[in-house]
Amino acid sequence: MQTVSTEFDTIAAISTPPGEGGISIIRISGVDALKTASQIYRGKDLNKVNSHTINYGHIIDPENGNEVDEVMVSVMRAPHTYTKEDIVEINCHGGIVATNRILQIILGLDARLAKPGEFTERAFLNGRIDLSQAEAVMDLIRAKTDQSMKVALDQLDGNLSHLITNLRQNILDVLAQVEVNIDYPEYDDVETMTARLLKEKAIEVKAKIQQLLSTAKQGKVLRDGLATAIIGHPNVGKSSILNHLLHEDKAIVTDVAGTTRDVIEEYVNVQGVPLKLVDTAGIHETEDKVEKIGVDRSRKALSQADLVILVLDSSVPLRDEDRELLRETNHMQRIVVLNKSDLEVKINLNELQEYVDDKEIIKSSAVSPLGTKDLEDRIAAMFFAGSIENTSNNIMVTNARHIGLLKQADTALDAVLEGIETGMPVDLVQIDMTRTWDLLGEITGDSYQDELLDQLFSQFCLGK
C-alpha cells in the first residue's frame, strides 16, 4: 500500500442523498479545496481557521455577490482527513435547488465533479486505507443488520488487513531465508533443511487461510443477505407469510388464486440474519401466458435460493404439485410452513412425513401472526442463531473477491506442499510460495490493476 500522498486535482460532489432534507453536504477535496471554498464563503477567513472546526457563514455567488444560502462550513487540513488532502464540507439547507446551486458555483471555479467513489479511491491511493478497508466502506453503507455493520466496521478498522499483512510478512521472511540458504549454503543438507522450512511455513499459512475461508458462507449471508424463496401452489398464503415476516403489508393478499404474478423482493432482518425475501408466483401448470412467465421466474428464484420456505395449505389434501415441490427441495435448506392452521386440517400428516422431518415444519395462519415467531426462530437457528460464529479471532471474510483470492492462495500452497513431497527443487517450489504472497497482496491492494480500481470504486455513490 502506498504511504506517500499523491497530488491530485480538486474534486467536489454532494455527499448526501438527493431530495428534501434537513441539510445537504457538499464535499470538496484537493490541493485547492480551501482556495475554492474561500472564494464563495462569507464569514471567517477559512485559510486562517483551525483545522477540524466548523464555521458559520453564507455562500455567495462570486459573479454577482448575491447570497445563496446560510451554511456551516467544516475545514479539515491534510493529512488528517478522509482523503489525506485538504477537505472542506459545506453544510447547507437540504433540498435540490440550493444544494445544486452551490455545487455548480464550486464547479465553475477550481474544482471538477468527483467520480463515484473518488474520495475513497484517494484515501486508498494516498495510503490512509488499504483496498480491503476501502471495500469495507461500501459494505458499511449497504449493511442491513447490526451484525453485518459490525463485520464491516471490523474490516474498516483493519482487522483483516493486519492478518493478511502478517501472513505476507511470514511468507516473505521464509522466502528470504530460502534465498540465503540457496545462495550461501553452509551445510551439505541445505536442500532438505530449506524444503522443511518451506513446508512448515506453508502448513502454518494454509491453516490460517482455511480458518478465514471457513467463515465465507456466513460472511456472504451477512454481506449480501440470505436469498430466501417463498414458494408453493397458488393461494396457499405465500404473500401472507411475506407480510408477517416484514411486519407490514407489502404483497397483495386475496382469496383469488394467482394474485401474485411476478416476483416480489424485500429485505428483512430476522434476529440478525439479513433475508432477501422473494415472494414468488404460485408454481403450477398453467396455459395463461402472463401467469406462465411468473411461474418461470419463480422456478428461477427457487434455483438461486439459499433458503426455501415451502408453503403448504393444511386445509386441503396434498396436491401433485406439492409433492413435486417437496421432492425438488429435499436437498435444499428448507422450512415447510403449514399455512391456514386456523382451519380444519385436511392434509395427510403421515404422508407429509414421508417427505419432510417434523423439525422442518412450522404451523401458521394467514389471518394472524400465528407461527411467525417460530418461523423466525427456525431461520435464526439454521443460520448461526443470530450471532456471528467466528473461528478466526473475530475476523470474517464477506467479500467474494477476497474469498476467490484466498482460495487461489490455498491452491498455491497445495502446490508448494506437493512439490516438496515429490522432491521438486526448492527454487521451483519457491515460485508457488511467491505466488501465495502475491495473491494475498491483491486483497489489501499491495498489488493491483487500474481496471480493478475502476471496477470497485464505480460501485460507490457520488460524494463517497
UniProtKB/Swiss-Prot annotation:
SUPFAM superfamilies: P-loop containing nucleoside triphosphate hydrolases (SSF52540), TrmE connector domain (SSF116878). Its main location: cytoplasm. Mg(2+) binds at residues 239, 260. The keyword Metal-binding applies. (6S)-5-formyl-5,6,7,8-tetrahydrofolate binds at residues 27, 89, 128, 464. Binds 1 potassium ion per subunit. One of its GO terms (biological process) is tRNA methylation. Its EC number is 3.6.-.-. It is found in: Cytoplasm. GTP binds at residues 235-240, 254-260, 279-282. K(+) binds at residues 235, 254, 256, 259. The keyword RNA-binding does not apply. GO terms for molecular function: GTP binding; GTPase activity; metal ion binding. One of its GO terms (cellular component) is cytosol. Signal peptide: none annotated. Residues 225-384 form the TrmE-type G domain. Its cofactor is K(+). Keywords: Cytoplasm, GTP-binding, Hydrolase, Magnesium, Metal-binding, Nucleotide-binding, Potassium, tRNA processing. Belongs to the TRAFAC class TrmE-Era-EngA-EngB-Septin-like GTPase superfamily. TrmE GTPase family. Homodimer. Heterotetramer of two MnmE and two MnmG subunits. Exhibits a very high intrinsic GTPase hydrolysis rate. Involved in the addition of a carboxymethylaminomethyl (cmnm) group at the wobble position (U34) of certain tRNAs, forming tRNA-cmnm(5)s(2)U34. This is tRNA modification GTPase MnmE. It comes from Pediococcus pentosaceus (strain ATCC 25745 / CCUG 21536 / LMG 10740 / 183-1w). The gene is mnmE.
